[in-house]
Amino acid sequence: MSGRPIAVIAGGRTPERDVSLRGGHRVMTALNGLGHDAWLLDPADVKLVESLDARPADLCWLALHGKEGEDGTVQRLLDLLGLRYTGTPAFDCELAFDKVLAKDVLRRAGVPTPDWVVIEGSALRDLGAGVALPRALEWIGLRCIVKPSRSGSALGVSAVERETELAGAVMGALSFSGAAIVERMIRGTEVAAGFVGAALEALPLVEIVPKDGVYDYSARYTAGATEYFVPARLDAGVASTVRDAARAGTKYSVAPAVYRAL
């Protein structure tokens, strides 16, 4: 693929803009170093379709994060334009980005996923559901994780260990999405499982050890805030179980994923 024109799409208008731009610039630099003609397009600064029409690309390298970049939006647009792009097809992106849909698909397929309840922002606003919030803990248990249903980079994610913390955590999640998930907290070793190629060749498991205990936005993007071990420090049987669960997730279009190995 030497010398191919490649448009790196990064930035956008989401809260993950800065992270996306950092990644996009690194990709562009690496591609140019390999002899390609790569340039960066930021949808917040340019009209994407007009820019792609004016300077055609053989490939669009997607480095957008969050809404529009990971939810199938830009993928559907590029499909309409007949342009090739990196990453997952539009429908798979849409399903994986929506945690409510993704967890429901996993549960129906028999893939382990922590118990959860969904708190819709409209139910709080229009139906007086706020008084029912404590009942979520009756289903899930006191220790839980609250997260936006549609967001990335762990923005709006909170760990709740007291009932008094729940309302604030839900409102924080709803600032990033129209619904919040209250999910049972799982204690264990956190690992990321990845695959490459159509044959789903397994990459080494990555063990994730955030120093403050929660793998939130700061832990992901602050240098030194998290330790990573590759391969993960798991025995062979547990590692195999994790890979099998992650591979099953790809079958139902809800990978990539992060798993906790108990």
Language-model features and meaning:
Residues 1-104, 108, 120-134:
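ATP-binding N-terminal substructure of ATP-dependent carboxylate-amine bond-forming enzymes
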Residues 20, 114-118, 143-168, 190-192, ...:
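Glycine-rich phosphate-binding loop of ATP-grasp-fold ATP-dependent ligases
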Residues 39-45, 182-184, 254-262:
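A short glycine-rich, hydrophobically flanked beta-strand micro-motif that places a catalytic Asp/Glu
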Residues 105-113, 172:
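Basic phosphate/pyrophosphate-binding loop/patch that engages nucleotide-derived ligands
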Residues 106-107, 136-155, 178-187, 191:
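ATP-grasp fold ATP-binding core
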Residues 131-132, 136, 252-260:
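Peripheral (often C-terminal) accessory segments that flank ATP-dependent C-N-forming ligase machineries
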Residues 161-244, 249, 254:
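Phosphate-binding site of ATP-dependent enzymes
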